[in-house]
Amino acid sequence: MRYFRNQDICVRLEGDSIKGANSFSFDSSYSSPKVEVVGKGILTRSYGGKNESVGSISALILDDGSDLYSKFIANSGVISNGSLGSSDVNFNFNQGYINSYTLNGGVSTLPSDSIEFVAYGEIENEEIDPQDNIGEKAFKSKSEHIQSFNYSISTSWKPSYIMGTHLPVNVSRVEGYTISLDLDLIVAGSAMDSVMNDFEKLISGSNDLTIT
């Protein structure tokens, strides 16, 4: 199953809504659970996989005060469930993980996002009603002091697979993430703490990060 769309869509990951910005692709590597048999006779082993689909979306987060970023950090990019919607099609999946997440911004502009993720498990396709009802709210940060910034999270999390029947062993699972931040900041020394706290809250949902 391959699906591409060039219009606004709605994405919901762990309860947070993201509205697409004219760019979305969704490609399923196979439509049913994949099983590979290795060996012969009593040495035969079954390798059971899951449905896997790769999706990418260029998006703008519209929910004011969203803690989507901190969820990605806390869960190493793991998505417990989610749905991808547009004007007439909806995709649901059980689990997935974030490959990478990038947030860009500048003076007098709302931040823009880029998210790439892999969904797996029960992936379904169904007709739905239009769901374009997210209200836009501006971020309440002192962006006039921030010239530009680029914030990204990349994860190496992979789904688990089971090998064997009597004594199953989990294989092909790697967890971890990398965070990077490029920031061009112009602010007087007396206002540094206030501006940095606002920016930290913007990118993480809290102001307890340390940016040096």
Task: Locate predicted features.
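Signature of extracytoplasmic/envelope-associated structural regions
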Residues: 1-212
